[in-house]
Amino acid sequence: GNSFFGGNIQNAAIAENNSNTLAISNYNRLKISNDGGLTFTEVSQSLPNQFITDIAFDPKDDDTIIVTYGTYGNNSQKVYMSSNQGSSWQNITHNLGNMPIRSVVIDHTDDSTIYLGAEIGVYKKSMSENTWELYNENLPNTTVMELEVVYGSNTLRGTTWGRGVWEYSLTGRENFPSILTTRISNQPTDTQPKEGIDQFVTSMIEYDGDLNSVYVEWI
């Protein structure tokens, strides 16, 4: 339990560019913190009174948040987006059917592609589009419980209900092989690395094309 909701925190997300900005939810309530969790502001007053299943920040904009709902009802209230950290919300359910949405991730592309793990399959659209597209290449007809963007291999990975883990190429990205090797300058020991000492990470990939930009995420 916790004093924020009087119950368990069921979902949490941390902004990509500022780890002091985070969002947490319990059932239908959503709160935002900008001081690393010391204080929270509730931002769910205008959101549906339904169970929140997931939260995601836009990796390019910490003010943009998407929340998903796990309801079966014919209410067109499955996905909501805020561009001002919850001060106001926009319903972006659009053409999705009457099914629960289990998971949401946002890719670090120019268009900020949104992926949804749904009761049946995966759906995607860019941040600016108004239509969701089924993204189900070779995926079994099953519930997608969790999604994750795997930057090292340019793939979207999803866990399903009883049908294993599946992986497929991200949209809007040029394919390239996975990272071949990664090493750091000082291998961790009981005494290393010392605080304040820089660590250098070297990764090797095999690629024949020209790279205009490279995005690196340290997890």
Question: PLM features: residue spans?
Answer:
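Blade-level signature of beta-propeller repeat domains, shared across WD40, Kelch, NHL, RCC1
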Residues: 142-173
